[in-house]
Amino acid sequence: MDKRLIAERFAKARGTYDREARVQQQVAERMMRLVLQHTGGDAFRFRNVVEFGCGTGSYSSILLHTLKPETLLLNDLCPEMEECVENLPSAGGSPQAGPSAGGTVVRFRAGDAEELDFPTGTDLLTSCSTLQWFTDPAAFFARSHRFLKPGGILAFTTFGPSNMHEIRSLTGHGLDYLPLDEVRRLVASHFDVRYAAEEVVSLPFADPPSVLRHLKLTGVTGTEKRMWTRGRLQAFCEDYTRRFARPDGKVTLTYHPIYIIAQNKSL
């Protein structure tokens, strides 16, 4: 996993990500609903929140306005993402307001979440659409439970093996996505899993070039290094249309979100 290349691709896409990342936004909204549903419904129990892989801040904004925590630490691999989240309005209505202003203290910390130490005593460690980029999820889970207070919550989404299967089947390139059962097993070594589920979402596009444009503008081509020659692009588009066209002539791109909510076992 080339983390440098991943960071570079997402940094370049930060100005277009929010417009293009329709599925990721839907996933973030559902994640928040599930967190409340499976942790007792008390939005105000989460005083200290850490989000790793915050990106441009779409999920961060949901966390801020729904939970209204005292502190929100935002982390991302890309230092450039700080400019995307620095003006998030706080729960009190102003950017990065402190507790005395009735708002949330919002801080940003750049770095690889697989290597960073987050604050101990955290109530909620959470992320959307990030963990699929990790080199060693098992090691992260083994470390992350130490950052949570007893009974603290780990809540995240990732993607499963059917994610963007169209691209992988045609190019032979893609991430090695873990299936739901494997993700649940890894988490259960250190947490009590309260909720684990998956869904498959099929997005329609006018044509294969529109699919490639979508991927570029969201930055999710982070591991792809190939050069598109005219001949290779033409062959890709023809194969994509032949294999993945709908009756109405549009083509599809599949997303496979996985949702996990777990409680810290440590006492």
Question: What is the role of each PLM region?
Answer:
Residues 114-125:
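A short acidic, Gly/Pro-enriched loop at the edge of an enzyme's catalytic core
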Residues 20, 56-58, 119, 178, ...:
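Conserved Class I S-adenosyl-L-methionine
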Residues 138-153:
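A short glycine-rich, Lys/Arg-flanked "PGG" loop and its adjoining helix->strand segment in the class I
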Residues 48-116:
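Class I SAM-dependent methyltransferase SAM/SAH-binding core
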Residues 149-210, 221-230:
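Conserved catalytic/acceptor-binding region of the Class I
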